[in-house]
Curated annotation (Swiss-Prot):
UniProt subunit comment: Homodimer.
EC top class, as a word: transferase
Highest taxon in the source lineage: Bacteria
Keywords assigned by UniProt, alphabetized: Amino-acid biosynthesis, Branched-chain amino acid biosynthesis, Cytoplasm, Leucine biosynthesis, Manganese, Metal-binding, Transferase
Function text: Catalyzes the condensation of the acetyl group of acetyl-CoA with 3-methyl-2-oxobutanoate (2-ketoisovalerate) to form 3-carboxy-3-hydroxy-4-methylpentanoate (2-isopropylmalate).
Reactions this protein catalyses: 3-methyl-2-oxobutanoate + acetyl-CoA + H2O = (2S)-2-isopropylmalate + CoA + H(+)
Gene: leuA
Domain Pyruvate carboxyltransferase: 5-268
Subcellular location: Cytoplasm
Annotated Pfam families: HCS_D2, HMGL-like, LeuA_dimer
Record protein name field: 2-isopropylmalate synthase
Keyword match Metal-binding: yes
UniProt binding sites for Mn(2+): 14, 202, 204, 239
Length: 513
């Protein structure tokens, strides 16, 4: 059995299924480039047959990413598989991931197919896919709740037809670690040709055990691929968290005995990028990537860490991308110092023009904020990369007036395509007034589901505010994120960012979990 663990990232497919986490083509491409820097083995770029937008995103990623295998999901039918193959045509290494449900509940209630019909559909789909691509992954949806005897028949059949990876999903997060690990092991032992494929795990977090179940599937079951997402992003309670699985295997190599290709120093930049793009803020106590992951408040702990870090730290913050350099930048810092901080933070901009634009934003921020921290730099770079996407709505100017005893009002100038709009409105506060001013011109009628503010850095009233806005329109939910030292400006940016996602909406068909 191989001692190499394959990391299969599905942030751009399964992660995006989280309500409000929809991403544009350019956002997906930007995250894919970061995943390549992270050195994940496989990037599931999307579900090419679900929409024209997803097809274009998969195609764009396949055309530019060279160091990771690019994968597209496809239902077990010729149309989906052909569409996936077409989108992946430019990939250096391509994989088609096809699936069909195998649990009695799904076959009867959703598919309305008999077990024999499902078995035949699985066989034919893998055979068809193998004629188009040499790397085929098969998933029995709701595999963990499937009858083991029937599941073994399906898995044996698809291996015979050319499946190279077998992925066993715990689609609804029902599994318990020991039981799931034994389930994978029993399948491997009972399927006669199991040695001809790599076994994979895909766990959801409904009971909070996605990471534990995945690791049990590896250690007990012998799986050699883990499907996961950055920050554990995903529908309902989320997916297995990439950063947690990777650091568990790396930190406890004495137990797992497995090697990883992942460059762990790129974990925090990837986490920050996904959080900023989707609007799903990372909780402070999140393992590995949370703001408090390496913080020590207890005096006893602080004393121990100062004397010897390994008294209370089992991994180093800098190993996962938290900078060990505590130098704070300011308005006198030059371009070279700024570029060095980008390098230290693992941020790779695509061109000198992007570096120059980010540096100009840095100087503008430094004029308004005396000290610039790493978190500020990560936020402004993400903001700059979003600006480069030629978005439909762009904030041009904003002013607001608020006095005690008077109703606040705001004036907003923004562009919608090539048209410049000026709007004025009052409101219950300056944020409310600003959003009402924008809405008076765009007239979407979108429902505001969420408005939240987080301080990007702590310990100062100068901290930038990061605002997340969640809108719903016609059954579609989107998030927008904006950052600025002025909370009102950050709020307007976030609202326009959400409107941009509504403007570029694309209908998608449902995928497996």
């Amino acid at each position: 059995m191989s001692d190499q663990l394959i990391i299969f990232d599905t942030t751009l497919r399964d992660g995006e299924q989280s309500p409000g986490a929809s991403m544009t083509r350019d956002e997906k491409l930007r995250i894919a480039r970061q995943l390549e820097r992270l050195k994940v083995d496989v990037i599931e770029a999307g579900f090419a047959a679900s929409s024209n937008g997803d097809f274009e995103a998969v195609k764009a990623i396949a055309d530019v990413i060279k160091d990771s295998t690019i994968c597209s999901l496809a239902r077990a039918n010729d149309r989906d598989i052909s569409r996936a193959a077409e989108a992946l045509r430019g990939a250096n290494r391509a994989r088609i991931h096809t699936f069909i449900a195998t649990s009695a509940l799904h076959m009867e209630k959703k598919l309305r197919m008999s077990p024999d019909e499902v078995l035949e559909q699985a066989r034919l789909s893998v055979r068809f896919a193998r004629n188009l691509c040499g790397d085929i992954e098969f998933s029995p949806e709701d595999g963990y709740r499937s009858d083991p005897d029937f599941l073994c028949r399906v898995l044996e059949a698809v291996i015979d037809e050319g499946a190279t990876t077998l992925n066993i999903p715990d689609t609804v997060g029902y599994a318990i670690p020991e039981l799931y690990g034994n389930f994978i092991r029993n399948l491997r032992e009972r399927v006669p040709n199991s040695d001809k494929a790599i076994w994979s795990v895909h766990c959801h977090n409904d009971l909070g055990m996605a990471v534990a179940n995945s690791l049990a599937g590896v250690k007990i079951g012998g799986a050699r691929q883990v499907e996961c997402t950055i920050n554990g992003l995903g529908e309902r309670a989320g997916n297995c968290s990439l950063e947690e699985v990777v650091m568990a295997v790396k930190t406890r190599r004495d137990y797992f005995g497995l090697d990883l290709r992942v460059d762990t120093s790129q974990i925090v930049p990837a986490s920050r990028m996904v959080a900023q793009t989707t609007g799903f803020v990372v909780q402070p106590n999140k393992a590995v990537v949370g703001a408090n992951a390496f913080a020590h408040a207890s005096g006893i702990h602080q004393d121990g860490v100062l004397k010897a870090r390994d008294t209370y730290e089992i991994m180093r913050a800098e190993d996962v991308g938290w900078s060990a350099n505590k130098i704070v930048l300011g308005k006198l810092s030059g371009r070279n110092a700024f570029k060095q901080r980008l390098q230290d933070l693992g941020i790779a901009l695509e061109s000198e023009a992007e570096v120059n634009a980010a540096f100009m934003k840095f100087k503008d921020l430094a004029d308004r904020k005396s000290e610039i921290f790493d978190e500020d730099i990560l936020a402004l770079v993400s903001d700059e990369q979003s600006d480069n996407q030629a978005e439909h709505y762009r904030l041009l100017a904003l002013s607001q007036h608020s006095e005690m005893g008077e109703r606040p009002h705001a004036e907003v100038a923004f562009a919608a395509g090539d048209v410049e709009h000026h709007a004025r409105s009052d409101g219950n506060g300056p944020v409310d007034a600003s959003i009402k001013a924008i809405e008076s011109k765009v007239g979407t009628g979108a429902e505001l589901l969420l408005y939240s503010v987080n301080a990007i850095t702590s310990g100062s009233t100068e901290s930038q505010g990061e605002v997340t806005v969640r809108l719903q329109l016609g059954g579609r939910i989107v998030n927008g994120v904006g950052a600025d030292p002025d909370i009102v400006v950050a709020s307007a940016k976030a609202y326009l960012a959400a409107l941009n996602k509504l403007h570029s909406k694309a209908e998608r068909v449902a995928a497996q979990g």
